[in-house]
Regions:
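Acidic/His- and Gly-rich active-site-bordering loop/insert found
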Residues: 2-120
Length: 121
């Protein structure tokens, strides 16, 4: 299976990287109300990505930012359930002077992607 995934990524690397960069360009800073629309746009982007991957996906509105729920139930009732839990928002990028490139413009340096939200701890 790992070989299949590697082959798939190799064959689609430019498209996959482009989609990731599109997502990383969204300043989904949930801690700042001026980015509420951006945060919703990130949720909508994620829902669309799930749908393109064949999942049933929806946004669930909350008192805060929407939850993105996606599911794929074709494996069969006798198969285990897998839950992936994460977040699509980011923290503020300040202080900006510590960035070598704009935080919401993905940049590749030394084979690594630099952008706000490209990794998490």
């Amino acid at each position: 299976m790992a070989t299949d995934l590697t082959a798939h990524f190799d064959a689609n690397a430019d498209r996959i990287r482009g989609e990731l960069f599109d997502f990383l360009r969204i300043p989904s800073v949930s801690a700042r109300s001026e980015h509420d629309a951006d945060t919703r746009r990130a949720a909508e982007w994620l829902r669309g990505a799930m749908q393109r991957a064949g999942l049933r996906a929806e946004l669930l509105d909350t008192e805060g930012h929407p939850v993105v729920l996606g599911e794929w139930r074709q494996a069969g009732a006798d198969k285990p359930t897998v839950l992936v839990y994460g977040h699509y928002d980011v923290q503020p990028a300040e202080p900006l002077e510590l960035w070598d490139s704009p935080p919401f413009e993905p940049t590749v340096r030394d084979g690594r992607i630099y952008a706000r939200g490209s990794v998490d701890d």
